[in-house]
Amino acid sequence: MKERTIIETIKALFKRPFTIKYPYEPSPAPEGFRGKPEVDPEKCIGCGACARVCSAEGITIEDKGAERTISYFYGKCTFCARCEEVCPAEAVKLSREFELSDYDKSAFYVKVTVPLLTCRICGAPFVPKPQLEMGLEKVADLLKKYNIDIEKFRQIVEVCPNCRRKIENIEAGRKILMVMMK
């Protein structure tokens, strides 16, 4: 038995190694590997769906003035891919990158800034502009189908919830909804 083991060991020395020489040679990630989330700031609409589903609280939202900042902190990320699943704009994609260690802390943070739409009446910021534009694009065909003027609809939705309660604008919105629901 010992003799056979020694012979196999000597043969193995001259064959190719069984393991790769990581970290000196890159190791490919397996298929389906969930690595670092990559965020495309051009696609992000600022809806915050990713922050709402992040169980590790690695994604935060902060509204300051007329801007919304969404911050991604990879140090807390569990690579669950929930942010990728819920993003309506497909702005978040998980890469196959797994070597995330770095001495620079700023390498663990990604910030995306999105402008907020201000209310037509009071001027308070209340919804991300790209999110509203995406929503209007999605309902444009439906509005045309029911002969509803898209500009009139835009005026209704560009009023914050507080002002909407105070004016008759909500009645116009209800009428539009009633026409669409028939």
Predicted regions span which residues?
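Non-ligating segments of multi-cofactor redox enzymes
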Residues: 1-64, 74-76, 82-85, 90-182
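Phosphate/diphosphate ligand-binding glycine-rich loop within oxidoreductases
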Residues: 68
